[in-house]
A protein has these predicted regions:
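Charged phosphate-binding loop/patch that engages nucleotide di/tri-phosphates or the phosphate backbone
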Residues: 2-5, 138-146
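Active-site scaffold of zinc-dependent metalloenzymes
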Residues: 43-82, 95, 99
Length: 146
């Protein structure tokens, strides 16, 4: 069972999270035990430059999603509800990848279909886990938020 706890999310975001969990984790075995904690906070990262972040392993993930970001002149800019939903979908995709053992917090290796691929040489946006997360970010927000 996928257990999700949230902090700072409105009811609409909670419904969106539920829809994303069903879409992302539908192929997991029935006896899967995985815990996901999602916290909505004003800023993520030291300088408010991240829209979201996911730390995890094969047992649980901790997700933080920002409601605002810091512009170069220290101007505080709010994310739109749609952008926040996109960040939630993106980070939930990483939680799925952690749960399946496809990624870890140690190295830049992508594991899928019993193959491991070293991705140290790839730019950030070409890492397979980011390609998948950006794709699901778009798909899930278009289907369940739009």
């Amino acid at each position: 069972m996928i257990k999700v706890s949230t902090e700072g999310l409105t009811q609409r975001y909670d419904r969106f999270v539920d829809d994303c969990i069903i879409a992302l984790f539908d192929k997991e075995p029935a006896d899967t035990d995985y815990n996901i904690s999602i916290t909505l906070k004003k800023f993520v990262g030291d300088n408010g430059s991240h829209a979201g972040f996911c730390l995890g392993d094969e047992e649980s993930s901790e997700i933080e999603v920002a409601t605002h970001w810091m512009y170069e002149d220290d101007e505080v800019v709010p994310y739109t509800d749609f952008e926040i939903a996109g960040s939630i979908a993106h980070e939930l995709t990483h939680a799925k990848q952690f749960a399946r053992g496809q990624i870890n917090m140690v190295n830049n290796v992508w594991k899928t279909n019993d193959l491991s691929t070293d991705c140290d040489h790839l730019p950030y946006e070409e890492h397979p886990w980011e390609v998948e997360a950006y794709a699901y970010e778009t798909i899930l927000t278009d289907i369940y938020w739009g």
